[in-house]
Amino acid sequence: MLLINMHSWDPGGATESKSKLYIYLRFLRIEQTFFSLPMAYLGAFVAIKRIPPIPILILIFLSLFFLRTAGMTNDNLADREIDARNPRTRTRPLVTGKISVKEAKTIIALSLALFFISAHFVNFYAFILSPLVALVVMSYPYMKRYTAFANYHLASIQGLAVFSGAVAVLGLYYNSFVQVMEGIPWLFVIATIFWAVGFDLYNHIPDAEFDKSMGLHSFAVLLGNKALPFAGLNQLISVVLAFLGDWFYHLGIIAYIATVLHGLIMLYAFYLANKGNFGKAFYYNIYSSVVLGIGVIIDIAV
């Protein structure tokens, strides 16, 4: 039986009275943006099997940062009334008024504009795909009003980091959209999606009863006590696909070691989740992707 302290953890909460900068950083969950970066770079490195040009790496970071800022702000804005009713999320800055609705809308508009500008400077294919990528990101908070597959929608956003990193570099070498799509390291894209379903469920399981009362959908609500094993199954599939990616894309021993560590850290996160410590489980699960991303990058770079 899971023992969950539902009021103890919220990655987007800001209970302390600190500077406006601190409040913005908590609001945007800025650390998660940096944790996503290695997976975007993994996509870029695996796609061309060499170190990408530094300007492109900088543009990948900027694009990821601006789009994630827009997406996270939109998520908070769309859910502000729901968050106000949830004991776990009622300290979020948009709920408490530390950040205003007007500020949030301004952040979204500026961030989306800067994302499209960054994508334009990456390459033609990145730019023409940018509206579709933005649509996937910005529509997420509304999906959970309708379907449990919102967990996979969120996970697909994480997979888009790998996809977008690959497009950013492949567009430098190919003039055909088909060639760019063929060069995407799809095994790692799909592995990332299954990995992300697990950590998203760690976020939703503590809120399952509340979400059910609000008419919100997730696999945590749909599956009840079976949601945690379902999260573990998704992550097992993720590890298998990551190993297949190592093999299919002819990566070396460092990548394989990183994949083993990736799986072991996820296993520990699953253990923590079984103990009801979803806060630590959530972050250890993110750490596992950082290990995988950095390991694959080092493997190719050396």
Segment roles from a protein language model:
Residues L2-V302:
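Multi-pass alpha-helical membrane architecture of UbiA-family
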